[in-house]
């Protein structure tokens, strides 16, 4: 909370959480700030009889945050829909709300044969309905974050998302995306700011969407110190989700082994391993 006024501020911040039946949980904190001061507020409470969110039962709550003056006058109010769900990795298996999760997913580009790369809400919803009818439960936003309306619809209708940062390094000396530490952007400090800005912008914008269960740091961009720092930041900022990074090749910068275009023999070899350490998701095949 940032006091943009040139005078001190006294008042309160109220948080209301409303479920689909209108049941409300309310919390409030008093605040006193000097001019220009910034403070961080956290609210903690137990929500009774939580209705968990999943792709099969997309239960949502509406959170409303209201800033009031000491006399009760409303200064500002904002709201968003969110949900409660738990994503885990146990014994190299991906779990949602304690149940093993099998990803049946696709990659998504903004494209329509009639409108080109302009996709509106109606077209988004048509795609979601088509996917749900065909037992598709997950989407990778290849290779960039989608409009916020897409995430709202996935929250509402129940699609799991791998949210991918708009980073790609084709044409930067990446013969088959191999590592070139002398000049590749993933290793060069002068490129760190550009990489991290895109990753942080994605996380901060989409962090309240329950449909987002995995962050992807980018597509086909090699792997180096730039991504090591980005991975560390994501894990510190958001401990409720996991990181998928295809170029990590199952190393320390990814929580999920997520190769592209593996052969059937390679997938069988992985499936028959006695002690796998990470879940396995084929993240791209036939450019889809």
PLM feature spans:
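Secreted/periplasmic carbohydrate-active enzymes, especially glycoside hydrolases
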Residues: 1-161, 198-199, 213-214, 230-236, ...
